[in-house]
Regions:
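Active-site catalytic loop in hydrolytic enzyme cores
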Residues: 61-64, 86-194, 259-263
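C-terminal beta-strand edge segments of enzyme domains
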Residues: 197-198, 204-341
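Cys-nucleophile CN-hydrolase/nitrilase-fold catalytic domain and related Cys-dependent amidase chemistry
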Residues: 16, 25-110, 172-197, 201-204
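Short amphipathic alpha-helices and their capping/turn segments at secondary-structure boundaries
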Residues: 21-35, 153-162
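Extreme N-terminal starter segment of soluble prokaryotic enzymes
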Residues: 1-4
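CN hydrolase (nitrilase-like) catalytic-core segments centered on the catalytic cysteine
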Residues: 61-79, 146-244
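Short beta-strand scaffold segments in enzyme catalytic cores
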Residues: 80-82, 93-97, 131-133, 224-226, ...
Length: 341
């Protein structure tokens, strides 16, 4: 069994030292309660609405404040989130796995919302790497930050890369109050739908830790959860209340679910790779749909009025333009063909 503790906290905006002290306090409380994995929310060390404060609270990975916090994780796995500053002085919203006194893994937020009340791209750079990581728990962890999970490729890639436990740390504001929603809050209903769907589709545990409290008039709703690999809620923390919430899970559930429902086994990665390559080139205006005539818009998977012999070979290209010679080989380069204007 693995005991998971969700630290649903209300960090103080810009008060790095105070938030570090609160993290150490809750880590020790979780340790005393027998926790194996402790998860804090997005930017739990700094608060969310930082804007120009981001430069003041940013830490490099060798910052003594971060390494001191890591030193408090003996015999524990802890996920914390902070503003990371790179060697070239870019700032990232980061989530780090601290284990046995070390910084073991760092994920930089991939998708920075800059719409509505969000303005992250003004102050942060986007990450460009996604990796699952082994852990002392005996399971692979896939760590993502808030908006990352609004892009379905992220949980899928983490699970395919070896994650059995998907961890999302979040600072999600409460929006869309309506009695018609399951919990009276549209944001919460949306996140709950996402977490259950991802758990089922990846046959993984999903750990969602959201903050509470208020930053600059923005209210965060909490509602942290642990979802089992068949999509059932194992733990649901209350909305808006601060606290440390724990639950025991058996990682054997992942094995049982993946044997009975082998979705990851049956993913056709070579097909995805090939078709994604085609889509990328089409979006860049450098290739046509594989079934379209030159000058025609992208068509069907198989052109319905084409004779059988045409379906089995690529369309003719204008003189001097190379055609697709991969013959279905996903490792072959995709032809770089520009659309006619």
């Amino acid at each position: 069994m693995v005991r998971i503790a969700l630290a649903q906290i209300a960090p103080r905006l810009g008060a790095l030292d105070d938030n570090l002290a609160r993290h150490r306090e809750l880590i020790e409380e979780a340790r005393a309660g027998g926790a194996d994995l402790v998860v804090f929310p997005e930017l739990g060390l700094t608060g969310y609405q930082l804007q120009d404060l981001a430069a003041e609270v940013a830490m490099r990975l060798d910052d003594p404040r971060l390494t001191t916090l890591a030193a408090a994780t003996d015999a524990l796995s802890v996920v914390v989130s902070f503003v990371e500053e790179s060697d070239d002085h870019r700032r990232f919203i980061a989530a780090a796995l601290l284990e046995d006194g070390e910084v073991r893994h760092v994920h930089r937020k991939l998708f920075l919302p800059t719409y509505g009340l969000f303005d992250e791209r003004r102050f942060f750079a986007a990450g460009d790497v996604l990796r699952a990581t082994p852990s002392r728990l005996g399971a692979g962890l896939g760590i993502a930050v808030c908006e990352d999970f609004w892009h379905l490729g992220v949980p899928q890639l983490l699970a395919l890369d070896g994650a059995q436990v998907l961890v999302n740390v979040s600072s999600s504001p409460g929006r869309d109050l309506a009695a018609t929603h399951e919990v009276g809050l549209g944001t919460a209903s949306s996140w709950r739908n996402l977490m259950r769907a991802y758990a089922q589709l990846t046959t993984s545990f999903v750990v969602f830790c959201n903050r509470v409290g208020v930053d600059e008039s923005v209210t965060f709703w909490g509602g942290s959860e642990v979802i089992g690999p068949s999509g059932q809620a194992i733990l649901s923390a209350p909305l808006f209340d601060e606290g440390l919430f724990t639950v025991d899970v058996s990682l054997d559930e992942v094995r049982r679910e993946r044997i009975s429902l082998p979705l990851l086994r049956d993913e056709r990665l070579e097909w995805q790779l090939r078709e994604l390559g085609r889509v990328v080139l089409e979006r860049a205006g450098m290739s046509l749909d594989s079934t379209a005539e030159w000058g025609a818009p992208p068509g069907f998977d198989v052109a319905p009025d084409a004779p059988d012999d045409r379906r089995s070979r690529p369309p003719a290209a204008p003189d001097g333009v190379p055609t697709d010679t991969s013959n279905g080989d996903p490792s072959a380069p995709i032809p770089m063909r520009r659309r006619r204007s």
